[in-house]
Design a protein with these regions (language model features):
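Active-site neighborhoods and metal-handling regions in enzymes and metal-associated proteins
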Residues: 1-407
Length: 407
């Protein structure tokens, strides 16, 4: 087997930059080590922290990373059958082990090897500002408490998420490739969606466009198709042949090298209702308002409240509208979503109410008209935005206008 697999990888310089940044934060908290529970849930979003320091992840791989303040990182994956593959897929971590007995036993064993069984150990996966439920199973946590009774296990809260909020040049390069995959997916929908073609056939063609050009699974891809679809795309396509004047609304998180972008569009097989065009025009007006108000040093909340003013002035209502950070996960920092305002006002307090150069986020605007069909149908639009030194730049190139297809 080849010693190096043809997969996206970042440089050792990038690894060293990340290791230094994380260890600075660890020192400030007095942490001897951190354990990052890379649990493949919610399209692999919960593997982001461990993958950030290892490049191990994808296709629902478990990656529990033990990262000491001094010494070598250790990645624990689920099965020994994938050890050689992960050693060939990346060069950041050489100590890769399979789970032995239980996850708690596997982690405790490495902590004891490091002679940190009485140390202060930070962990993600516990309840924190971005996830009030956490994702670490109770029995795993209890097992660690039992196996490491002298250790001080503490929650990391959003320590890693803050470090990940501003992207490096290498990360931006990977995200641009992910955005290109999104453009290909939209072009595939444009070229294949026709009356009589099954929804699932178009969906499959769009997925082929992503994976066939180097993209990675799993990723979020939501879809709905109907004369008057739900206000928000659903989870799965149906086997129904599409009909004239059907509206397609889709949300994709195109993924490359573990990095997600976010793009949404509305298509119609034929001529849409004038109300649908009016709603979509509202999406574009809100989008332009955001671009005009995003930029380094500018207040996040002010920009997003201006977006809401545009929506309100047009008599439209929000299904979803706002921004959320993108990188190795979705729903990263920065976040300010009008449909989850209480949580995200707190997020602004945590990370600050200013855009910074290098931030990348989804800007989605999914709207309805409450006076039409009771607000139960609408249009969607979203793109991934990069904050540059001089303003805001869209990462996608696919046309923004309403997509009329052959009916």
């Amino acid at each position: 087997m080849r010693p190096i697999l043809e997969l996206p990888r970042l440089s050792m310089k990038e690894r060293d930059r990340r290791y230094a940044a994380v260890r600075t934060q660890m020192a400030a908290r007095g942490l001897d080590a951190i354990v990052l529970w890379g649990w493949p849930m919610m399209w692999d979003f919960y593997t982001a922290n461990s993958r950030y320091l290892s490049q191990i992840g994808g296709n629902a791989e478990f990656n529990v990373l033990i990262f000491p303040a001094v010494g070598e990182a250790t990645s624990i994956i689920q099965l020994p059958t994938f050890l050689d593959g992960w050693r060939a897929a990346q060069d950041w971590v050489t100590d890769i082990r399979p789970r032995a007995k239980t996850w708690a036993h596997s982690v405790a064993s490495r902590i004891k090897e490091l002679k940190l069984e009485r140390g202060k150990i930070g962990m993600d996966g516990l309840a924190g500002p971005l996830d009030p439920d956490g994702w670490l199973p109770r029995d795993v946590y209890q097992g660690l408490l039992d196996l490491l009774p002298g250790a001080n296990l503490v929650a990391l809260d959003d320590m890693l998420e803050k470090v990940r909020a501003v992207k490096s040049d290498e990360e931006l390069g990977v995200l641009r490739k992910a955005a290109q995959l999104g453009d290909l997916m939209l072009a595939t929908c444009r070229d294949t969606a026709r009356v009589g073609v099954k929804e699932c056939e178009v969906y499959a063609s769009m997925m082929h466009a992503m994976v066939g050009n180097g993209g990675e699974e799993p990723t979020l891809f939501l879809w709905n198709c109907d004369r008057h679809p739900y206000p928000h795309p659903f989870r799965v396509p149906t086997v129904r042949p599409m009909d004239s004047r059907d509206l397609i609304i889709c949300e994709m998180h195109p993924k490359f090298g573990g990095y997600f972008t976010h793009v949404e569009r509305t298509f119609c097989l034929g001529e849409p209702d004038k109300e649908q065009l009016r709603i979509y025009d509202g999406c574009l007006a809100a989008y332009q308002c955001g671009l005009d108000n995003f930029g380094p040093g500018k207040p996040i909340s002010t920009a997003l409240m201006a977006v809401k003013d545009v929506i309100d002035e047009r008599g439209l209502a929000i299904c979803e509208a706002g921004i959320h950070g993108h990188g190795l996960a979705s729903l990263e920092y920065p976040r300010f979503r009008h449909h989850a305002l209480a949580a995200d006002q707190q997020a602004v307090k945590v990370i600050g109410d200013r855009f910074e150069t290098g931030m990348v986020f989804a800007f989605n605007i999914d709207l309805v008209d409450p006076r039409w069909h009771g607000g139960k149908t609408g249009c969607v639009f979203a793109e991934t935005i990069e904050i540059t030194a001089t303003g805001a730049r869209r990462m996608h190139t696919y046309p923004t206008e309403f997509q009329r297809l052959a009916g």
